[in-house]
Amino acid sequence: VASFAFLFISSIGFSQNQRIEFKPRPAEFEYFEYRNDSIFPLKTPIDNSASRVFESKLPYPIIFIHGLNSSSETWNDATDYYDTQYSFTYGGRFDLCLNADNNNATTNKNFFPTAGADIAAFESFVQNGDYYYVNFNVNPNGSVGTTVLSNQSAVAKQGAAVKVAVQRVMAVTGKDKVILVGHSMGGLASREYIQNS
């Protein structure tokens, strides 16, 4: 199976059909993945608000979107290299469950708190940074490491979720464009966002 990345630059506006409310979750779900009987720490942004004025090394922030049967942790080796070699700053991760109603028989692009919504965007620490992650490997309660086929959801739902991440990154950074980098299915999610937003 070949895997490849797409690179898109997007300047799509802020129009949104519905107001997005970020779903609360226990704090430990943001920082750890619970898999089988093990606990794995997740990449976490270092709060830079008090220590310095953030100065981006890039003209536009990058949003990394993982592929099918994967998670945002896919990007750790590459971004750790960027951090050490280019002093990039990790801005945070957007955790989105794409099967929030836990019903595989229906599908929609509605967001929490709408009744029967398939998509839940979870509250997470996001700051001004050079790059961000989108993570679809999320359960309806906000824990990372899905058991509800969130990763395998329709590309249309992934595109709607990418839109939320793009809008929030643009709001946090003050930039009018972002760079989307998607691996495999993440490239299709990026294309869906660009073509249908």
What do the predicted segments below correspond to?
Residues A2-S10:
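Bacterial N-terminal signal peptides
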Residues S11-S15:
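Sec/Tat signal peptide C-region and signal peptidase I cleavage site
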Residues Q16-V181, M185-S197:
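N-terminal non-catalytic accessory region
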